Amino acid sequence: MYLDEYKRWLAADLEDSDLHPELAGIEGNDDEIKDRFAVALKFGTAGLRGVLGAGTNRMNIYVVRQATQGLANWVKTQGGNQTVAISYDSRIKSDVFAKTAAAVLAANGIKVRIYDALMPVPALSFATRYYECNAGIMVTASHNPAKYNGYKAYGPDGCQMTDDAAAIVYEEIQKTDVLNGAKYISFAEGVEQGLIRFVGDDCKNAFYEAIEARQVRPGLCKTAGLKLVYSPLNGSGLVPVTRVLNDIGITDITIVPEQEYPNGYFTTCSYPNPEIFEALKLGLDLAKESGADLMLATDPDADRVGIAMKCPDGSYELVTGNEMGVLLLDYICAGRKELGTLPEKAVAVKSIVSTPLADAVAAHYGVEMRSVLTGFKWIGDQIASLEAAGEVDRFIFGFEESYGYLAGPYVRDKDAVISSMLICEMAAYYRSIGSSIKERLEEIYAEYGRYLNVVDSFEFPGLTGMDKMSGIMQGLRDNPPASIGDKKVVSVTDYKNTEATGLPAANVLTYGLDNGATVVVRPSGTEPKIKTYFTTLGKDLADAQATKDELAAALAPLFK
């Protein structure tokens, strides 16, 4: 069957000139043909993500057309404005895929608001809400290597699409022939007909104003003299991040030159992920050279930000996603409490795999901390529930350990633009009182205990990878470990059991150990990986690290 589909593509008059040579080049290579055509990329709540190239299991204009036709079929049942917002990042063919999606929607009589240049995830979420759209599309593969691209779908609230809506869209996609089933006109024709319009300056300015309104101490940065090194990692963050920072008074910004402008090949780092050192190295080197107070790097779609801080002794230290989540929570709560802007019954939200240190900090300030499933849409869901109750102003902060933060209800996905602003403001504040981010972090550890949070990943590539991952997770359910190393398991939480957790079902297992440590095991939602999240508490960092290392060594054989 996959050979027949391959032959159909090979014989077709394909519009993308890159695809036919690829197809001709794999003729007779059964393994390669099978990998490209035996299955199709599956549309889920995170949309699509895959390697660029020819085939149903690849990202190309035909797969994008098919997906967009499925989305269009759903939009047409939703009433409302019959409008979809679109943005894209710097990845290879992101602009092509964005215009392709716009053209399919226009051919279906659906209006489109598309950015005239690359803009990040939060800008897409904002435009979806601003124009009261039925849906939004963000063409990106986040921090994946250059050979990937993807297609994130958003609901009318600017949050990633719900499970129910995604399932309906997927059904419609399956009814649509990938090569010729989608309605299609040219992008130019869609513009000429008035169906495709660019996002206006009114929307762009409103986005920046919404972010800048969330400063904790407005005006502080104008006189702080903060010195910053910033890298957009060749992605979409350059314009919005520098615009907001300049607006609030941070003007001493040095951009990492090799990573300044959009480049989907990501030639300076094979994996443009601000969680890893390789992506931050050039920025860190430049920070050391220039004596900057802070170095920030945003990922290609600018929804996550990595940080290196200057320590009192002049050295530089990377800050983890959990640490920055706690630091921002502490800064926002303390600052707003001091200034009288902390709402009554304030609410913060974190994912279940993020550090419990955040719970302790929230409790200290009288803030309700809610824990939700992994995936920022669940944080967005909590904002929506507050909004439905007329209490959206209670939301002050949400974060995930994977370097994603949000400090306001103006969008419903993580936002590296506001995160960059607040991190800089926080650094400027501590600088103004003769302290530093590093010193405040150590004060937090002294007050609440030395938490260590580490994520390990195990990769399962290829067609058999998903089956192997499923088998491992099922094995853990069928034969739960009584101990991990020499630490006894005292509690097991299976998030597929909705009655026990009070949350939607999820393929996540949490083990509580007799020494107070926790281990969370879950498959990645976007990559062929199983992730293990370790939280250990020790008298100092070395003690907490030693416990983590023992637990990781004991678990590793289960993932082979």
What are these regions (language model features)?
Residues I211-E212, C221, G225-L245, G249-T251, ...:
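Long hydrophobic segments that form regular secondary structure
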Residues K288, A292-L294, S315, G335-R522, ...:
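Phosphate-binding and adjacent anionic-ligand microenvironments
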Residues D4-A101, N108, V191, I196-A224, ...:
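An N-terminal, well-structured beta->alpha segment
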Residues A85-Y148, G249-G306:
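N-terminal small/polar loop signature for handling phosphorylated ligands or for N-terminal nucleophile
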